[in-house]
Amino acid sequence: MEAVKETELVHRYDPAYDTTGITNEIALDGFALSDLELLGIGGFTPLTGFLNEDDYHSVVKSMRLANGAPWSIPISLPVSADQASALRVGERAKLVYKNDIYGVIEIESIYTPDKKVEAQEVYRTTDEAHPGVAKMYARPPIYVGGPIVLTKRVNYERFASYYIDPIDTRRIFAEKGWKTVVGFQTRNPVHRAHEYIQKAALETVDGLFLNPLVGETKAGDIPADVRMESYEVLLKNYYPKNRVHLSVFPAAMRYAGPREAIFHALVRKNYGCTHFIVGRDHAGVGNYYGTYDAQEIFKEFEEGELGIKPLFFEHSFYCKACGNMASQKTCPHDSEHHVILSGTKVRQMLKEGVLPPQEFSRKEVVEVLMRG
């Protein structure tokens, strides 16, 4: 497969930036802090800051920035009415989390979004039972937009060696001689269906970038440290060492389904991927999205416009009659022979203390999950 041309990364990290004399302060929540860091290190290229009003409305309505560049998820900085009343367009404000300054924003816009419209357009629902919608509604009501400078990095104590910036993953891929790299996004332990599609993709490209999300997720999702250990044992025992790279994606999960699939692809392009795996119900939750909505949405962009090629995979399963993993494209047997795998099912089994069978997960992975 041919490589896709790399885009230049935005770089907004400056630890020497002088914040003295800036009196305005904006308190960040954990969600905004992870967004700030990704803006600073180029993970959200082409964004240079939290969306101003024009870009916000354009992204919500058309999945593009005001200049036409593809971008599907609004990266917003919410503030309370009290905080907003002290801020002025044209001024700078320190971005503070738990009394530490992590950055500065140059304020271009202060605006009140219609969150119902945002929910319907971005999440395709206004239902407050949807975790992404609930999170958005619970955050403050006014948005502040403008370019940022990241002045302090977040200190990640857990699995620190797996936090690798886009500029460094690009270098690592180049050093490995990978011209084509496929990215895989997950918030679940890797089960046999994931392994099947990852290895199918790996047949056609030089390298696999396993990039699990370790930012904020919903209650009930398996903790990141347990997941990381499960990835380590899987890669060690079942993947070729020179063809796989594992590092984490420090973003919060939005559960925005199709729009988040576009977002995840654009971000992995920044990390150096040329291809991106989109399976069934990517970034979905509950029954809010159709099985392949996250694949269909890519048709809304011209070929080549995203700068990364999506690889679409159908629902895969373990077929007892075939004796291996398969999909509708490769298996002739009826569904009674199929063991349907999903992260939800694995989580449910673990919760009930039931050992997931060999068809679901590798033995080494199951041992880690049961301990966790």
Swiss-Prot record:
Catalyzed reaction equations: sulfate + ATP + H(+) = adenosine 5'-phosphosulfate + diphosphate
Listed InterPro entries: ATP-Sase_PUA-like_dom, PUA-like_sf, Rossmann-like_a/b/a_fold, SO4_adenylyltransferase_pro, Sulfurylase_cat_dom, Sulphate_adenylyltransferase
Transmembrane as UniProt keyword: no
GO molecular function, one term: sulfate adenylyltransferase (ATP) activity
UniProt key word Zinc: no
Top-level taxon of origin: Bacteria
Keywords attached to this entry: ATP-binding, Nucleotide-binding, Nucleotidyltransferase, Transferase
Protein family (similarity comment): Belongs to the sulfate adenylyltransferase family.
Entry-linked NCBIfam families: PRK04149.1, sopT
Protein name (database record): Sulfate adenylyltransferase
Taxonomic placement: Bacteria, Bacillati, Bacillota, Bacilli, Bacillales
Gene label: sat
